[in-house]
Amino acid sequence: MNAKDFGIPQNRERVFIISIRKDIDNGIFEFPKPFELKLRLKDMLEDEVDEKYFLTYDHLKRIDNWKSFQNPLNCVLGGNDISQTITTRIAISDGGGINASTKLYCNEIESKINLRNGKYENKKIRYYTPLDCWKLMGFEKDDYIKAQESLTDFSLTNNQLIGCLYKQAGNSIVVDVLKHLFIELLKINILKGIKL
């Protein structure tokens, strides 16, 4: 199942295996049917972000080969595109900032993205923020805020906190995909009478 087939503009394919006990299986379970994606990447990303998420001229100079952006895996995504797969790989430099990467934010569906990726907007290139990543996993801003607040008890530096939020997003299952799976299970009363 792919997140982009269930309302989230991210190309994130995952295999789901559904097991149903024999004594309650009525044999009519069907995986949810994909539907047309209406949201685009620009609909999910924050409009106003801290300047630290934008690549500076020095960062851009460090990128060895600008032609690498022609390679789909090293592409700068545009606002009408679908995000590549959010993963847990992040880059925090020794100086405490976010490291430059040749994988940034061009056009069309990409096959894979890591959390170092960014967005091209107003001729500026930026990385996804932790909130961007959470939203691309189907979470609401309130969910992100609760997770952020729960991490404040651990005496983390700001960079450690940001790293944890990126990793939590990258390790998550897209909420909308699970929601549609559960709807199909509920349609056939699989969960009726079962204590969860």
Over which residues does each language-model region extend?
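Generic recognition of stable, solvent-exposed alpha-helical segments in well-folded globular domains
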Residues: 81, 131, 173-177
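Conserved proline-anchored active-site loop of SAM-dependent methyltransferases
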Residues: 17-21, 86, 136, 170, ...
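Cytochrome P450 catalytic domain signature, combining two hallmark sequence patches
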Residues: 25, 143-146, 191-194
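FAD-binding beta-loop-beta segment adjacent to the flavin cofactor pocket
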Residues: 109-160
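Class I S-adenosyl-L-methionine
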Residues: 1-93, 98, 102-108
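A broadly conserved detector of short glycine/acidic/proline-rich loop/turn motifs that flank catalytic sites
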Residues: 21, 90-92, 132, 140, ...
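Short, loop-centered acidic/histidine patches that primarily coordinate divalent metals
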Residues: 89, 139-141, 168-172
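Generic C-terminus detector
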Residues: 162-196
